[in-house]
Amino acid sequence: MKLKETLNLGKTAFPMRAGLPNKEPIWQKEWEEAKVYQRRQELNQGKPHFTLHDGPPYANGNIHVGHAMNKISKDIIVRSKSMSGFYAPFIPGWDTHGLPIEQVLAKQGVKRKELDRAEYLKMCRDYALSQVDKQREDFKRLGVSADWENPYVTLTPDYEAAQIRVFGEMAKKGYIYQGAKPVYWSWSSESALAEAEIEYHDLVSTSLYYANKVKDGKGVLDTDTYIVVWTTTPFTVTASRGLAVGADIEYVLVKPAGETRKFIVASELLNSLSEKFAWEEVEVLNTYRGDELNQIVTEHPWDSEVDELVILGEHVTTDSGTGIVHTAPGFGEDDYNVGVANGLEVVVTVNERGIMMENAGPDFAGKFYDKVAPIVMEKLGDLLLAKEEISHSYPFDWRTKKPIIWRAVPQWFASVSKFRQEILDEIEKVKFHSEWGKVRLYNMIRDRGDWVISRQRAWGVPLPIFYAEDRTPIMTEETIEHVAKLFEEHGSVIWWERDAKDLLPEGFTHPGSPNGEFTKENDIMDVWFDSGSSWNGVVVNRPELTYPADLYLEGSDQYRGWFNSSLITSVANHGVAPYKQLLSQGFALDGKGEKMSKSLGNTIAPSDVEKQFGAEILRLWVTSVDTSNDVRISMDILSQVSESYRKIRNTLRFLIANTSDFNPTTDAVAFEDLRSVDQYMTIRFNQLVKNIRDAYENFEFLTIYKSLVNFINVELSAFYLDFAKDVVYIESAKSLERRQMQTVFYDILVKITKLLTPILPHTAEEIWSYLEFENEDYVQLSELPEAEDFANQDALLEKWNAFMDFRGKAQKALEEARNEKVIGKSLEAHLTIYPDAEVKELLESLNTNLAQLLIVSALTIAEGDVPESAVRFQGVSFTVERAEGEVCDRCRRIDPTTKERSYNATICNHCASIIEENFAEVVAEGFEV
């Protein structure tokens, strides 16, 4: 036997190298086969419910880092709730209708208009479901625990029927109406868009300054007067029917030198416009308030048969332009509102593909709307005063990345204005985890217009509306419920497979159809109505979930998307918000803080992270950043996270190894019988437990990460475990001192493994497999630890916190001695302490082996004068010299009692007593040399 074998060196097969890319799929397969998710739900049956409702990602392509961050965050929350006494099933979902899938099929060569509608929809459905399967595997590979066998998918018959019923309740309350309002129109998609489907980019546009001649001045202006207007959309001049002025804005009538014409412009803008138009010596003839110009008639710049009426508009400002806005009610929301209020004609001169129509005039018909500025300028002739190219923020179709226009077309709307206050009142009841989130959603609802819910596309849920022979829309409770039942049985494809009369209840009649003939709506619903109905299709209809849901958690872009549409439909149906709490996340940016883009080559695929580091590192990264704001990710950042993981893993490996001979049932020591330092560490750990439990409760992942890493690196590794080796390696295996420390080790090991489970389930499960005395076969089936309180813990903490301050000073003194080559390692030191009365009382009260705690071979508490050479601090001074004696081959301390023993060992008296007591046979025979 060798001397080294008398040490209690920790033994474990738990590997230092994690091998996560290979091990994670093995664990995931085992969990699936053992039905761990289902068993967790069974364990929690009858407990308080917690419903985190999954916002459905769009089923197209592999998941990206943003998807991963979101789903991992949800998984951490649901796992922590499941381990905290809540019944918290997690039903993942997918959004499956919409234009992107139509575009994919088009790229694959599918000709939509050459196919039967039902056949085309089947192709869309098959593609969508293939993407659901692909993304499901992506999410499972992240270690997300969910009911993967029973997700919700917005194309299933039960979901579509639930969506129709949401629509039906809104129709019943009078919230659904048809109108020809201007809407965001995407010529590239040939469809109306919702606000959530637009994004803003800079665009260079041609802006024109031109003049309308006064036709009837109403006794205020002469007919040789011209009113100057500005437009950034020249094509809309073809449909201009009015000029809007601000009622309280001051306007001036001016005559520039050399001009026979007189002009009206906003007084505030006269100087800048004079420079722009090269007007010199401008004579101001008169001033007017805007309301004095109201109802003056001007003529269209190139069509004298068309009148343009001066009207008042609250949207008019003097921030730019001329202070007068040309009004084309068919091409703008403000234009429409003020135009209709003043009886202006609503004219639309652009078709669904962005092509100018016949009613624009022969010079324009057949041309693309964005290419007609030169024709407009030619038609304006000397009425054109200036032309500029301007760069401004402009709305684009978020899918095709092409600019859009406002265009009045017959559409179906959901009225928000009818119950807006009810929605705002519900927002006040929701718990937001950021105040700016509440303000953002509140302002969006307060300021938004009615919701355009119709789309002129193929792949989606049909609007369940019929038309009588006289074109009266029909959407009664009876007809809508009948359609819902048909969808429930056959899916929405039946809408396209049957004639209208076969979709109506048997024997249905309507006064508008004396001949019994009916037609059906061809438009589909906005996809935001699809996902916005999920509270009904999933949360209400799944018995394991509770409505309203406890939490919605998505990216901050969903304030105008899913958060918004879900809120509107839920309040419209039931008068309540669909969520009790709302939590939003920022976007994942690259390492430089730039937006990720395939074209820039700066994207990081979750699959690449899994191959290089493992999903655990991606999961740990999610907790290491503040996800409420935009976050950065790169392979370098993940390498740093991987290093944190390595430290966590190796620390826990040390605890596993050094409790391998510990049975918590027979060997554990009661708290009151622990040494003071062990009690201190137990109390500090329980403070960590409380902090982490609170952080889980408040979804504060970064707090968990920082608390955990700090505890492991600073309090455990750099303090407790640092000196613990002297005890657990050197003392007798069954000694009280060793068992005291092992009690603390085991308690921390078991509880920290549980605390880590929501974040690092694969690693926690691997650790758990080495804990033979724990009852649950999977750590996921255990409960998170509760923080304990101990008698006199505040006094104990105060004392040991003071010691930690003292320890920091002692370490500085040792470091100085090391720098001066007095010692090498701290174990070579004899540390002499010169304390004041307060520090001396503290050290004596600890009743502990200070040399052991400070990892020195000898320690003296001295009285009397402090030597000149001492390192001085407030309240205490130190001297450091080399300890006397020889190095013990067993404990590595320098000890004056170290000598060669008769059994071939050069060791100190303390180690000799341990060997002679526990290894009598070796003492007799001697150690191997």
Swiss-Prot record:
Belongs to the class-I aminoacyl-tRNA synthetase family. IleS type 1 subfamily. A motif ('HIGH' region) lies at residues 57-67. Its EC number is 6.1.1.5. It is found in: Cytoplasm. IleRS has two distinct active sites: one for aminoacylation and one for editing. The misactivated valine is translocated from the active site to the editing site, which sterically excludes the correctly activated isoleucine. The single editing site contains two valyl binding pockets, one specific for each substrate (Val-AMP or Val-tRNA(Ile)). GO terms for molecular function: aminoacyl-tRNA deacylase activity; ATP binding; isoleucine-tRNA ligase activity; tRNA binding; zinc ion binding. It comes from Streptococcus thermophilus (strain ATCC BAA-491 / LMD-9). ATP binds at K598. Pfam families: Anticodon_1 (PF08264), tRNA-synt_1 (PF00133), zf-FPG_IleRS (PF06827). Keywords: Aminoacyl-tRNA synthetase, ATP-binding, Cytoplasm, Ligase, Metal-binding, Nucleotide-binding, Protein biosynthesis, Zinc. The keyword Ribonucleoprotein does not apply. It catalyses: tRNA(Ile) + L-isoleucine + ATP = L-isoleucyl-tRNA(Ile) + AMP + diphosphate. It is an enzyme of class 6 (ligase). GO terms for biological process: isoleucyl-tRNA aminoacylation. The keyword ATP-binding applies. A motif ('KMSKS' region) lies at residues 595-599. GO terms for cellular component: cytosol. PANTHER family: ISOLEUCINE--TRNA LIGASE, MITOCHONDRIAL, SOLEUCYL-TRNA SYNTHETASE. This is Isoleucine--tRNA ligase. Zn(2+) binds at C888, C891, C908, C911. Binds 1 zinc ion per subunit. It comes from the Bacteria. Its cofactor is Zn(2+). L-isoleucyl-5'-AMP binds at E554. Catalyzes the attachment of isoleucine to tRNA(Ile). As IleRS can inadvertently accommodate and process structurally similar amino acids such as valine, to avoid such errors it has two additional distinct tRNA(Ile)-dependent editing activities. One activity is designated as 'pretransfer' editing and involves the hydrolysis of activated Val-AMP. The other activity is designated 'posttransfer' editing and involves deacylation of mischarged Val-tRNA(Ile). Its main location: cytoplasm. Monomer.
